[in-house]
Swiss-Prot record:
GO MF assignments: ATP binding; glutamate-cysteine ligase activity
Similarity-based family: Belongs to the glutamate--cysteine ligase type 2 family. YbdK subfamily.
Keyword ATP-binding: yes
Organism for this UniProt entry: Bdellovibrio bacteriovorus (strain ATCC 15356 / DSM 50701 / NCIMB 9529 / HD100)
Protein name: Putative glutamate--cysteine ligase 2
Gene3D superfamilies in the record: 3.30.590.20
Catalytic activity: L-cysteine + L-glutamate + ATP = gamma-L-glutamyl-L-cysteine + ADP + phosphate + H(+)
This protein's record includes keyword Coiled coil: no
Pfam family, one: GCS2
Length: 378
C-alpha cells in the first residue's frame, strides 16, 4: 500500500483567529437577491483584499486578517462592512448576513465566472446549483496537525451548540421549512460535506485525503466540506457548521463564544481531561436536533443516550468559562449573547415577523436593517 503523502500543516499562533462571513446582496425594491458582485468588486477601495467573490453573483464574502482576539475581529469586520455597504448603496443594493434568503429561487441564480466554480458545477451539478446559502466560518490557530485533530474531536460534541446559536435560516425558496437551520441540510448534500469522518491523528487525516484524491472523489483537501475540518494551508481548525448570523455584533458574540470554548478545551486537554469522543450516530443526531429545533432541542450528552436541554447546557458551559471570559475581555460579549441571542434567536424573530405581517419581503427588510444598524448607518 502506498504511504500517504505528507500534508504540511502551516504555522500559526495558537488560537489566532480568522473569520469569514458570507453575505447576501439584496435589491431594495424587489427584496430579491441582486447579482451585481462583479460591479462591487471592481470598485473595492480598501487596500486589504478582504472581499471575495462567491459562487453566485448575488453573494460576497468578507474575511478578516489574522487576529489575536474578538475585539480585533469586530474592528476588522466593521471596517470592511462599512466600506462594502457604502459601495452597495451607490449601486442601489443592501446587505444581509443570515443563513438563507427567505424566498429567492436557486434556479434563478447567476454563477460568478471562475474556474473553481465551473469545476464545482460540472462535478456536483444540482447540488452545486442549490448552494444559495450563507455561512460563518471561524479559523482557530493550532500547534500542529495532531493538535488540530485532537481539538477537532473535542469540538465534535459542541457542533449542535454552535449550529443552534447561529441558526437563522427557517425559510427556503418562499416556504417555512419547519427547521431552525435549513441551510445546513443544503450544505451537507455536498458529496464530501457534512459530519466529519472519525479521525484520531494527523496521519489518519493524510490517509483519508490521499484515498479520496486517488479515487478522484476530491481534487484536493479543499473539496472536503466537513462541518469542522483542518485547514492545513493556514495552520488552523476551521469551524464551518454555523449559519450566517444577522449583523456583525451578533456575529462577533458567537465568535467570542467559540474562541473562549477553544481555550477552555485546551486547558482541559492540558489537565488530561477529555470528553468521550461522541459516536458518529450521536454527532449526526445532535446536528439534526439543532437543525430542527434550534436552542429548544434536547441534546445527547453521552454515547448512552442521556439528554439535556441545549440552552441549559450552553449556560452551564458559560458559567464554567466565566473566569476565562473575564481574563480575555469577553464578559460583555457573553452577557449580551445570553440576554439577547439565547433569548431571541433569529429563526424565532423571523417567524414571528412573518406571522405578524404575512410578508417575507418584510423579513428581508428586517434582516437588512439589522446589518445596517450594527454599522451605525442611518
Amino acid at each position: 500500500m502506498t504511504k500517504p503523502q505528507p500534508i504540511p500543516f502551516g504555522k500559526s499562533d495558537l488560537f489566532s483567529l480568522g473569520v469569514e462571513v458570507e453575505l447576501q446582496i439584496i435589491h431594495p425594491e424587489t427584496r430579491n437577491l441582486f447579482p451585481i458582485s462583479p460591479d462591487i468588486l471592481e470598485e473595492w477601495s480598501l487596500q486589504s483584499p478582504h472581499l471575495k467573490p462567491e459562487v453566485f453573483q448575488s453573494m460576497l464574502e468578507i474575511d478578516t486578517p489574522i487576529c489575536k482576539n474578538v475585539q480585533e475581529v469586530e474592528y476588522e469586520l466593521l471596517l470592511t462592512s462599512r466600506e462594502l455597504l457604502r459601495i452597495c448603496k451607490k449601486h442601489g443594493a443592501r446587505l444581509a448576513s443570515n443563513g438563507t434568503h427567505p424566498f429567492a429561487k436557486w434556479h434563478h441564480r447567476i454563477f460568478y465566472p471562475s474556474d473553481r466554480y465551473e469545476y464545482l458545477l460540472e462535478r456536483n451539478q444540482h447540488i452545486a446549483r442549490r448552494l444559495m446559502i450563507y455561512g460563518l466560518h471561524v479559523h482557530l490557530g493550532m500547534k500542529d496537525g495532531d493538535h488540530c485533530i485532537a481539538m477537532m474531536n473535542e469540538f465534535l460534541y459542541y457542533l449542535p451548540h454552535m449550529l443552534a446559536m447561529s441558526a437563522s435560516s427557517p425559510f427556503w425558496t418562499g416556504h417555512d421549512t419547519g427547521l431552525a437551520s435549513s441551510r445546513i441540510t443544503v450544505f451537507e448534500a455536498h458529496p464530501a460535506g457534512g459530519t466529519p469522518c472519525r479521525v484520531e491523528n494527523w496521519a489518519q487525516f493524510e490517509d483519508i485525503v490521499q484515498k479520496l484524491t486517488r479515487s478522484n472523489s476530491i481534487g484536493s483537501f479543499k473539496d472536503i466540506w466537513w462541518d469542522i475540518r483542518p485547514s492545513p494551508n493556514y495552520g488552523t481548525l476551521e469551524i464551518r457548521i454555523c449559519d450566517g448570523v444577522p449583523g456583525i455584533r451578533k456575529t462577533t458574540r458567537l465568535v467570542a463564544f467559540i474562541h473562549l470554548l477553544a481555550k477552555h478545551l485546551q486547558k482541559r486537554l492540558e489537565q488530561g481531561i477529555r470528553r468521550q469522543t461522541p459516536d458518529d450516530w450521536m454527532v449526526r443526531e445532535n446536528k439534526w436536533r439543532a437543525s430542527r429545533h434550534g436552542l429548544d432541542c434536547e441534546v445527547l450528552i453521552d454515547n448512552d443516550g442521556m439528554t439535556k436541554n441545549l440552552r441549559e447546557d450552553i449556560k452551564d458551559l458559560l458559567a464554567a468559562m466565566k473566569e476565562d471570559a473575564a481574563e480575555m475581555g469577553y464578559t460583555e460579549y457573553l452577557k449580551q449573547l445570553v440576554e439577547e441571542d439565547l433569548t431571541h434567536p433569529s429563526y424565532e424573530i423571523q417567524r414571528a415577523l412573518f406571522e405578524k405581517t404575512g410578508s417575507l419581503e418584510h423579513v428581508v427588510d428586517s434582516l437588512c436593517d439589522v446589518f445596517e444598524k450594527d454599522l451605525d448607518v442611518v
